[in-house]
Amino acid sequence: MLDVKYLRNHFEEVKEKLLKRGEDLTNIDRFEELDKKRRELIAKAEELKNKRNEVSQQIAVLKREKKDADHLIAEMRDVGDRIKTMDDEIRQVEEELNALLLSIPNIPHESVPVGKSEEDNVEVRKWGEPRSFSFEPKPHWDIAEQLGILDFERAAKVTGSRFVFYKGLGARLERALINFMLDVHIEEFGYQEILPPYLVNRASMTGTGQLPKFEEDAFRIETDDYFLIPTAEVPVTNLHRDEILSAEDLPIYYVAYSACFRAEAGSAGRDTRGLIRQHQFNKVELVKFVKPEDSYDELEKLTNQAERILQLLGLPYRVVCLCTGDLGFSSAKTYDIEVWLPSYGTYREISSCSNFEAFQARRANIRFRREPKAKPEYVHTLNGSGLAIGRTVAAILENYQQEDGTVVIPEVLRPYMGNLEVIR
């Protein structure tokens, strides 16, 4: 959520920056109109309340002097009714203003490249060289089916499309990756592990920016108004909702493994095969709470920490800075890490690392004090995938496949798989 004071004082500047996102300005224009109306209503209501106070004193004097005050009392009843009507109108306007404020995306950081779509994203760096195959590389779903480690067909029977059974060494590879990623982030980078709930309430989804705009992408338990988490970012960020932290506690680094659930409402016909786009998938998530002045340094660190996993796995990747038109709703700046997938002949997203500045903290009311008696300030929040497990499995199967259909297990994962070297 944007700072209301900043928005009021810089409407044109905010509009200009949101236009770079390709944003429709209808909501912000409506906000400006309603905000003006609210101020006018408050001024009129205050004027009436002042009048009521003055006349109340006059009535008290008349009563003390045993004079007739009926005409003033009748007038004040009318004023009281007008004040009540006006207060109700102010309340309605404020509710609409708050709803509009929740629908306005974050302002892009000045360093974000201007563009309309992913075609305008800017490559920052590459790591590793894509492998040259002496045979035609297969897509991961064909490799997995031949090895009997993933079963999409039975998952479709049991549940529906975009689900999968991991079997045997496939399940073991998934579990090995989860433990490996957690160990690296905890032992090498000092993250604290969190195992979060998979169901959250509406306030939590609103706090991180999934609601109200993206409700159609979420799985909702209607009886209790709970939501299945689309990412561990939601429960972990909301861990400190409505709290005031101490500056001494910052930065806070959390790492969480969880299943993630997404309706993928706008993805019909895209990535219909394989592990790239599933309704349920596992992910290791990195979440940071930091001082505002540190957040962009922390974004670089966060991205490097996610990259470290791919480097240890020996998987070629590139880092791209998302342009304004491809930026997520809550993000001020995002780096996507894209892993090389031979069957696609291109890089595909495996991690997204974002700085939300105070956008989420303002929605979730997460603050800190620099000194014990100092005025609370909003923290800056960041998060990134460290990494998406299913897409990492896909990348390993494709990049480490052999001509005979077997798959070599990356060396760093072998201790997690009983020192097994090959999936056959």
Swiss-Prot record:
Chain sites annotated for binding L-serine: 231-233, 285, 385
The keyword Ligase is assigned to this record: yes
Database matches in Pfam families: Seryl_tRNA_N, tRNA-synt_2b
Keyword Phosphoprotein listed: no
Annotated positions binding ATP: 262-264, 349-352
Subcellular location: Cytoplasm
Gene Ontology CC annotations of this record: cytoplasm
InterPro entries associated with the record: aa-tRNA-synt_IIb, aa-tRNA-synth_II, aa-tRNA-synth_II/BPL/LPL, Ser-tRNA-ligase_type_1, Ser-tRNA-synth_1_N, SerRS_1_N_sf, SerRS_core, tRNA-bd_arm
Reactions performed catalytically: tRNA(Ser) + L-serine + ATP = L-seryl-tRNA(Ser) + AMP + diphosphate + H(+); tRNA(Sec) + L-serine + ATP = L-seryl-tRNA(Sec) + AMP + diphosphate + H(+)
Gene Ontology MF term list: ATP binding; catalytic activity, acting on a protein; serine-tRNA ligase activity; transferase activity
Pathway(s) where this gene product acts: Aminoacyl-tRNA biosynthesis; selenocysteinyl-tRNA(Sec) biosynthesis; L-seryl-tRNA(Sec) from L-serine and tRNA(Sec): step 1/1
Entry's EC annotation: 6.1.1.11
Enzyme kind, highest EC tier: ligase
GO BP annotations listed: selenocysteine biosynthetic process; seryl-tRNA aminoacylation
This protein's UniProt keywords: Aminoacyl-tRNA synthetase, ATP-binding, Cytoplasm, Ligase, Nucleotide-binding, Protein biosynthesis
Protein family according to the UniProt entry: Belongs to the class-II aminoacyl-tRNA synthetase family. Type-1 seryl-tRNA synthetase subfamily.
Quaternary state and interactors: Homodimer. The tRNA molecule binds across the dimer.
Function: Catalyzes the attachment of serine to tRNA(Ser). Is also able to aminoacylate tRNA(Sec) with serine, to form the misacylated tRNA L-seryl-tRNA(Sec), which will be further converted into selenocysteinyl-tRNA(Sec).
Domains as described in the record: Consists of two distinct domains, a catalytic core and a N-terminal extension that is involved in tRNA binding.
Protein name per the record: Serine--tRNA ligase
Taxon lineage: Bacteria, Bacillati, Bacillota, Bacilli, Bacillales
Name of the gene: serS
